[in-house]
Amino acid sequence: MDGKLRPMTAVYITSGKKILLLYRVGSRVVEPSFCGVGGHFEKDELCDARACVLREMREEIGLGEEDLCDMKMRYVTLRLKNGEIRQNYYFFAELLPGVQITKPCCEGCLEWADMDSVLERKMPHTAWYMLDHYLREGRYTDLLYGGVTTGKGVVFTPMQEF
């Protein structure tokens, strides 16, 4: 292990009982699959995951924080893959009533998925386990969770400031 890091962000936007997914194609990191809207940090964002996800959201779907309510970072995960540590910062937010996504997404196809069946879709390993945890537990709390990916899933724990 030589210390290579790959920090990434994603936001999962909800609207009622639906969640916005991006079927991403052409990624340098994962094969075509469903994920949240987001991407890699720019150098000036390395200490600001929120700035990264807001930039990615504006670029990919044309939305800003003013179009959402209750946007919060809810998960930070780590995974060792291909000799690098992948750091994922996952945000969740609710789309404000009346706001629509009108910008075509150049990263793939957008889909509003039912939360009851979202886990049936092909997703990156860590994203699937994060969404599974969110749907079972995370959406009912205001906690920030840390997760470490293993061969059998992701081990989550609430993060606490002390």
Which residues make up each language-model segment?
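N-terminal strand-loop-strand
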Residues: 1-36, 65-66
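Intrinsic-disorder/low-complexity loop/linker signature
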Residues: 3, 82-83, 152
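Short beta-strand element of the conserved SAM-dependent methyltransferase core
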Residues: 11-13, 91-94, 147
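Unchanged
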Residues: 41-68, 77-129, 159-162
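Conserved S-adenosyl-L-methionine
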Residues: 72-74
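Short, hydrophobic/amphipathic alpha-helical patches that form generic packing surfaces
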Residues: 128-136
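Charged phosphate-binding loop/patch that engages nucleotide di/tri-phosphates or the phosphate backbone
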Residues: 136-162
